[in-house]
A protein has these predicted regions:
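Short loop/turn elements that flank and shape the SAM/SAH-binding pocket of Class I
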Residues: 100-105, 290-294
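Conserved SAM/SAH cofactor-binding pocket of Class I
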Residues: 29-94, 216-298, 304
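Glycine-rich phosphate-binding "P-loop"
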Residues: 23-25, 112-118
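N-terminal, charge-rich interaction modules
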Residues: 2-34, 56
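SAM-dependent Rossmann-like transferase core, predominantly class I methyltransferases
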Residues: 21-30, 35-42, 168-231
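Hydrophobic beta-strand segment of the Class I
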Residues: 111-112, 302-304
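N-terminal auxiliary segments of SAM/dcSAM-dependent transferases
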Residues: 2-5, 117-195
Length: 304
């Protein structure tokens, strides 16, 4: 299995996943990406079109469609980094990058959508996309068939309009909009988490991990904080909503706190939760691939 070379209607591409692993057995694209590219080759956007690429995992779509004006909208800092790396490696024009916490604006000739598995995030994105559509045929979505269920189609119906799935090709399906819902609104995507037992308030954006409950790993680590010596500088790696760092800050008010996550929505949630629970705290926030690119002082404690 060739894990790096994609033969597409838009040319041959050499693509790599991130994080990099020796003897990689997974590809930086899947059949849903190929299905989308085949569809776009058969139904090409006009030359000079402006395209919104949503949830392009490793930049496969951006590299293939680089002759167009592309904007990559994603919640993943890792995806954005991989996109830039793969475009550079193939000498393709890189897209403009837009984080999930920013709403895309302007007119788009095509909106090319990879469905996320998280229904809260799906709803959030579709509600924003609905504000951009002037006709159903501007939108084309895709996912692997095993991730498409009646609940996902119901979110389409509630958020943007009636949708239909294509026949499967290599276990992938395209999603076409058949109609647009009039007056579709954008809801507040934040969800308050019941954290009264901890004496703090937490709000989570749509794509934050375990946003509706306190996960087991966090409970375990919270219990372990009491065994640590007072840190001078602490990193909350994969911080999610910032719970561990916040509880560390309440225990050790003089500790410098650093929050890392690859999810823009996680970092946004952590920033707001720190502001609400630790006003005036010395905290820094980083949306990136682990600690890649961090060149500050070393940490004496890392929670993860």
């Amino acid at each position: 299995l060739n894990t790096t070379t994609l033969e597409s209607p838009f040319g041959e591409l050499t693509l790599q996943r991130r994080p990099r692993r020796r003897n990689e057995v997974l590809q930086a694209w899947d059949a849903a990406d190929r299905y989308l590219l085949n569809y776009l080759a058969e139904n090409p956007p006009p030359k000079g079109s402006r395209l919104l690429l949503v949830n392009d995992a490793f930049g496969c779509l951006a590299a293939a469609l680089s002759d167009y004006e592309c904007i990559s909208w994603s919640d993943s800092a890792v995806a954005h980094r991989a996109c830039l790396e793969n475009c550079a490696a193939n000498q393709r024009n890189a897209p403009a990058l837009l984080s999930s916490c920013e709403a895309p604006t302007g007119s788009f000739d095509r909106i090319i959508y990879r469905l996320p598995r998280n229904h809260s995030y799906l709803r959030y994105q579709l509600q924003h996309i609905a504000q951009l559509l002037r006709s159903p045929d501007v939108f084309i979505g895709a996912c692997m068939a095993k991730y498409l269920d009646s609940s996902s189609m119901a979110v389409f119906s509630e958020s943007i309009g009636e949708a239909a799935a294509s026949l499967a090709w290599k276990k992938a399906r395209l999603i076409h909009l058949q109609s647009l819902s009039p007056g579709a609104a954008v809801d507040d995507d934040s969800l308050a988490l019941d954290s009264s037992e901890l004496g703090i308030s937490l709000n989570n954006r749509a794509n934050v991990f375990s946003r509706g409950k306190l996960d087991r790993g966090s409970r375990l680590l919270l219990n372990a904080l009491g065994d640590l010596h007072t840190p001078y500088s602490l990193a909350d790696l994969g911080c999610g909503n910032g719970l561990l760092g916040i509880m560390a800050g309440k225990r050790w008010p003089e500790t410098a706190l650093h929050f890392f996550d690859e999810s823009y929505m996680a970092i946004d949630s952590a920033r707001h939760n720190v502001r609400d629970n630790l006003p005036g705290a010395a905290a820094q926030f980083y949306a990136r691939d682990c600690m890649h690119g961090y060149d500050g002082a070393p940490f004496d404690t890392i929670v993860c």
